Amino acid sequence: MADDEVKPIVRIADVDLDGHKKVPYALTGIKGIGIRMAYAICRELGLDEEKKLGELSDEEIERIEEEIKKLSEGESNIPSWMYNRQKDYETGEDMHLVGAELEMTVKQDIDRLKKIRAYRGIRHELGLPVRGQRTKSSFRRGRTVGVKKKQ
């Protein structure tokens, strides 16, 4: 492949990413990696943040994949306060989950809350807001028959 060509699609962590976007913004296409984590990964690996993802060499893409794998194991040099799962419920370790692993873990957490009948679990079961929002006028679904005034 010539140096001036840009790969239109790059596969990292089982996700097809847009090769025309700058590296940090392209990495946000992976579930569990936000813009701040994407910039942290680029700085950790010494990648040019202004480069397009499709312009990176295969070796650089491999390094990104390895760094994401290190994150999920908690072995990266990125500070643990940036991770999306600190003090895991089962293991007590700090880790950063991505992709299907993140979705599965969140679902297990919600199922655990439902099983122990915690307040948050009950709210999830009922399809109501979990974080204390008001429900008198918000989160209404479906049509209800209103009260008719006497004439």
UniProtKB/Swiss-Prot annotation:
<keyword id="KW-0694">RNA-binding</keyword>
<keyword id="KW-0699">rRNA-binding</keyword>
<feature type="compositionally biased region" description="Basic residues">
    <location>
        <begin position="133"/>
        <end position="151"/>
    </location>
</feature>
<dbReference type="GO" id="GO:0019843">
    <property type="term" value="F:rRNA binding"/>
</dbReference>
<keyword id="KW-0687">Ribonucleoprotein</keyword>
<comment type="subunit">
    <text>Part of the 30S ribosomal subunit. Forms a loose heterodimer with protein S19. Forms two bridges to the 50S subunit in the 70S ribosome.</text>
</comment>
<dbReference type="GO" id="GO:0005829">
    <property type="term" value="C:cytosol"/>
</dbReference>
<dbReference type="GO" id="GO:0015935">
    <property type="term" value="C:small ribosomal subunit"/>
</dbReference>
<comment type="function">
    <text>Located at the top of the head of the 30S subunit, it contacts several helices of the 16S rRNA. In the 70S ribosome it contacts the 23S rRNA (bridge B1a) and protein L5 of the 50S subunit (bridge B1b), connecting the 2 subunits; these bridges are implicated in subunit movement.</text>
</comment>
<feature type="region of interest" description="Disordered">
    <location>
        <begin position="131"/>
        <end position="151"/>
    </location>
</feature>
<dbReference type="GO" id="GO:0006412">
    <property type="term" value="P:translation"/>
</dbReference>
<dbReference type="InterPro" id="IPR018269">
    <property type="entry name" value="Ribosomal_uS13_CS"/>
</dbReference>
<comment type="similarity">
    <text>Belongs to the universal ribosomal protein uS13 family.</text>
</comment>
<dbReference type="GO" id="GO:0003735">
    <property type="term" value="F:structural constituent of ribosome"/>
</dbReference>
<keyword id="KW-0689">Ribosomal protein</keyword>
<dbReference type="InterPro" id="IPR010979">
    <property type="entry name" value="Ribosomal_uS13-like_H2TH"/>
</dbReference>
<dbReference type="InterPro" id="IPR019977">
    <property type="entry name" value="Ribosomal_uS13_archaeal"/>
</dbReference>
<dbReference type="Pfam" id="PF00416">
    <property type="entry name" value="Ribosomal_S13"/>
</dbReference>
<dbReference type="InterPro" id="IPR001892">
    <property type="entry name" value="Ribosomal_uS13"/>
</dbReference>
<dbReference type="InterPro" id="IPR027437">
    <property type="entry name" value="Rbsml_uS13_C"/>
</dbReference>
<protein>
    <recommendedName>
        <fullName>Small ribosomal subunit protein uS13</fullName>
    </recommendedName>
</protein>
